[in-house]
A protein has these predicted regions:
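Periplasmic-binding protein-like
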Residues: 1-34, 77-78, 174-182
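Extracytoplasmic/peripheral linker and loop segments enriched in polar/acidic and small residues
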Residues: 3, 92-103, 126-194, 216
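Solvent-exposed, polar/charged alpha-helical surfaces in well-ordered, non-transmembrane soluble domains
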Residues: 3, 7, 12, 16, ...
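Structural transition elements
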Residues: 7, 24-57, 74-77
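Pocket-flanking alpha-helical
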Residues: 13-18, 56, 101-132, 174
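Short, well-ordered beta-strand elements
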Residues: 62-71, 93-96
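Alpha-to-beta junction loops
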Residues: 82-85, 89-92, 108-117
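Long beta-strand-rich cores associated with HINT superfamily self-processing modules
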Residues: 190-216
């Protein structure tokens, strides 16, 4: 059913509807072009007919799912867009919006929810924290022996180019599992006055003022 829901969603459309296009489409494996070991395994393609087939095989067409999101406008819009597309595949799904205090108290316990993640410098950092069996923030409860073994191998490979070869297999494993729908990478912005240099926005919103300087 996870794979069916994933196949029902057009990530490019969700980026436009949920975030007004302010970002880049993602490919359902939580590793992106900002990571040195990112492997381009191709875009995610929506396949409504295959989604319907998987739903029929699972016999879950009459079950109603609940998609939970926090009460923040862009996250609500994103979850609404995802739910609408999943309904087009024939699944029943209702939306629940919770205030931030309630949502974040139980964010890792919801069966089906939308969560935002800040960036990490390395793809392996994200995967080890979020998808390895028994990991602290493994909200999806993903547990896959092949994935864990590949991730351990990647974590033990310091060279990014060599790690990329392993990462291609990891990304494919994660996407094929249907464990997440990741529609986009959200753009982050920073404003500064003319003459300020070295003040680029960090993906994790870190402040590195030791790199900032002023033109004379």
């Amino acid at each position: 059913m996870r794979r069916a829901a994933q196949l029902a969603v057009d990530n490019v459309a969700v980026l436009k509807l949920g975030l007004d296009g302010r970002g880049k489409p993602a490919d359902n494996h939580h590793v992106g072009p900002m990571h040195p070991e990112f492997a381009d395994i191709g875009p995610t393609v929506r396949d409504i007919e295959q989604a319907k087939k998987l739903i029929a095989e699972a016999g879950k067409a009459d079950h109603e799912y609940e998609l939970i999101s926090v009460d923040i406008e862009w996250q609500k819009s994103t979850a609404d867009a995802i739910a609408a597309q999943i309904r087009e595949a024939g699944l029943k799904i209702k939306r629940t919006v919770l205030p931030a205090a309630t949502f974040w108290n139980d964010w890792s316990k919801f069966p089906y929810s939308c969560t935002e993640w800040l960036g990490r410098p390395l793809g392996v950092q994200v995967l080890a924290l979020a998808y390895k069996s028994g990991a602290a923030w493994n909200e999806s409860a993903y547990a896959n022996k092949e994935f864990d073994e590949l991730l351990d191998k990647a974590l033990a490979t310091p060279d990014a180019a060599q790690r990329k070869e392993i990462m291609a297999k990891i990304e494919q494993n994660l996407r094929d599992s249907g464990i997440i729908i990741q529609p986009y990478w959200r753009s982050v912005y920073r404003t500064y006055r003319k003459g300020v240099q070295g003040c680029e926005q960090h993906q994790s919103l870190e402040q590195h003022f030791e790199k900032v300087w002023l033109e004379s």
